[in-house]
């Protein structure tokens, strides 16, 4: 890996809101959580011309190869900054909102902790496509328009939504906290998706929610054996005029 400033410079070129190109295909990868085999397989299959890779956060903790996983992703981001995009998950926000267990962070020296914390602060919060997709780690933030995502500050309520937010298929907006995680219901989901003019949400974060929810307008991906025996990714055709439901995505086990 290059020095800290080189990595920060590359990540800083991306805004908090990534606007994906309208060409080729996008591969969305859920929590990898130290499952380096999953990350390596994604690159072996899809790191090629015509494909953009969007990782949805949570690269560390839980799995056996957290450091190897995040260092590999950062190295690849340096090699192909316009082909690989790294979103922030709650496990990358440890320095902002600590949690436990956090085996990756707790094993680092003070110097190493500072190094990775500074890098993770530059990760993006969301990605959108021209044909109706929005991707975040948790839930879409309660902003009035997409451009406001660029102004979200770490530690804010909006930041907690995109990194820590849970969804449940029941009526309601904000439904309170469970285990420190803010929970949002069906009314919030519908309101935000309509307000942001997006048709399908692709997210990660919740390993035990159904993969497809909200009448096929929400897809939750887990791409790690840390939680489940099966690992999934999703591929979107960025050249389609519109993507209106999850059915129009290619969901694959890796």
Per-segment meaning from a language model:
Residues 28-30, 53-57, 85-90, 135-136, ...:
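Active-site neighborhood of phospho(di)ester-bond hydrolases with catalytic His/Asp-centered motifs
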Residues 78, 108-111, 179-241:
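Conserved beta-sheet core of the metallophosphoesterase superfamily
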Residues 51-52, 62-152, 157:
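Active-site neighborhood of divalent metal-dependent phosphoester bond hydrolases
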Residues 33-37, 61-64, 91-97, 141-143, ...:
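Active-site environment of divalent metal-dependent phosphoester hydrolases
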Residues 2-5, 9, 102, 111-112, ...:
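Active-site-proximal loop/helix segment associated with metal-binding centers of metalloenzymes
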Residues 20-27, 128-134, 215-217:
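Beta-strand-turn-beta hairpins that frame and shape the catalytic cleft
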């Amino acid at each position: 890996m290059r020095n800290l400033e080189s990595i920060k410079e590359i990540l800083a070129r991306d805004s908090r809101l990534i606007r994906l190109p309208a060409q080729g295909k996008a591969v969305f990868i859920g929590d990898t959580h130290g499952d380096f085999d999953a990350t390596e397989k994604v690159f072996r299959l899809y790191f090629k011309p015509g494909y953009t890779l969007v990782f949805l956060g949570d690269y560390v903790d839980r799995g056996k190869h957290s450091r190897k996983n995040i260092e590999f992703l950062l190295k690849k981001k340096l090699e192909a900054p316009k082909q690989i995009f790294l979103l922030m998950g709650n496990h990358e926000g440890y320095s902002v909102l600590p949690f436990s267990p956090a085996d990756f962070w707790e094993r680092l020296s003070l110097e190493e902790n500072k190094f990775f914390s500074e890098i993770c602060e530059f990760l993006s919060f969301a990605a959108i496509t021209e044909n109706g997709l929005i991707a975040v780690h948790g839930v879409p933030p309660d902003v009035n328009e997409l451009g406001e995502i660029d102004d979200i500050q770490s530690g804010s309520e909006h930041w907690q939504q995109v990194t820590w937010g849970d969804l449940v298929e029941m009526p309601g907006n904000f439904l309170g906290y469970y285990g420190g995680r803010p929970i949002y219901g069906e009314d919030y989901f519908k309101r935000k998706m309509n307000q942001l003019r997006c048709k399908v949400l692709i997210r990660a974060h919740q390993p035990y929610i159904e993969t497809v929810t909200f009448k096929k307008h929400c897809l939750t991906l887990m791409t790690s054996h840390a939680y489940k025996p099966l690992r999934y990714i999703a591929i979107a055709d960025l050249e389609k005029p519109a993507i209106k439901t999850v059915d129009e995505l290619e969901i694959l086990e890796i």
